[in-house]
Amino acid sequence: VEKTDGSVAPHLVVPYSLDCNDMRFVQAQGFNTGEHFFNYLKDSFDALYAEGEEAPKMMSIGMHCRLLGKPGRIGSLKRFLDYVQGHERVWICRRVDIARHWKQVHPFVPAAIGA
């Protein structure tokens, strides 16, 4: 990002979407039950895991304690995490961990302004 003084500072954006997100519990055409949430996460994971044979993939799950933290919903997340942990070559982490990893593996190299 170019700053007002003309210098350049790194700016990393970790993808976030409403696809695998508990906000869909409060949207029309969203999740009605924890089972719907679990099945959607599992199907998404299975597709990405298969695609990951060729190149790394990332699955971001948006969670909000006021939504997913309900007694009838939190079990679906626990079941999903158990399912994912049964697979090899999977890293379960927080968004900040993804950002730190990206910055370490792909350090910022400023490009020439106007190039």
Task: Give the positions of each predicted feature.
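C-terminal domain-boundary segment and adjacent tail
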Residues: E35-A115
